[in-house]
């Protein structure tokens, strides 16, 4: 699941960046066993330690288009990299212009990095 759902630390960072906790479709919840936290689909309210964002949750908050300062609209592209090792790349634009380029082996980390780039560069999330 670590490649499909954010960790508690990743979730907290995404919330700091502006991703609303209610966009997470899962939560980390305390159990009756001391020191044990489990991941589960949202239900009920008790014992929630942190939200857990899935790949689908993060894809939903990425804008499909962004506009740069020059007024040019760039469309979101996500694809497998053409490098020798398996990886993913994400950017807005086309073959000539690529804005917000991210490249990671983990698809989850790719989405997390893209959200961070958007927020730190003044772009709005799809909320």
State the predicted function of each range.
Residues 1-127:
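Glycine-rich anion-binding surface patch
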């Amino acid at each position: 699941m670590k490649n499909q759902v954010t960790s508690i630390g990743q979730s907290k960072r995404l919330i700091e960046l502006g991703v609303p906790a209610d966009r997470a479709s899962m939560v980390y919840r305390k159990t009756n066993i001391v020191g044990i936290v489990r991941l589960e689909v949202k239900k009920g309210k008790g014992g929630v330690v942190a939200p857990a964002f899935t790949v689908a949750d993060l894809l939903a908050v990425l804008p499909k288009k962004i506009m740069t300062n020059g007024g040019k609209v760039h469309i979101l592209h996500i694809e497998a990299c053409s490098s020798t090792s398996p990886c993913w790349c994400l950017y807005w634009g086309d073959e000539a212009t690529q804005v917000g380029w991210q490249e990671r082996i983990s698809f989850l980390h790719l989405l997390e990095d893209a959200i961070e780039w958007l927020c730190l560069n003044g772009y709005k999330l799809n909320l």
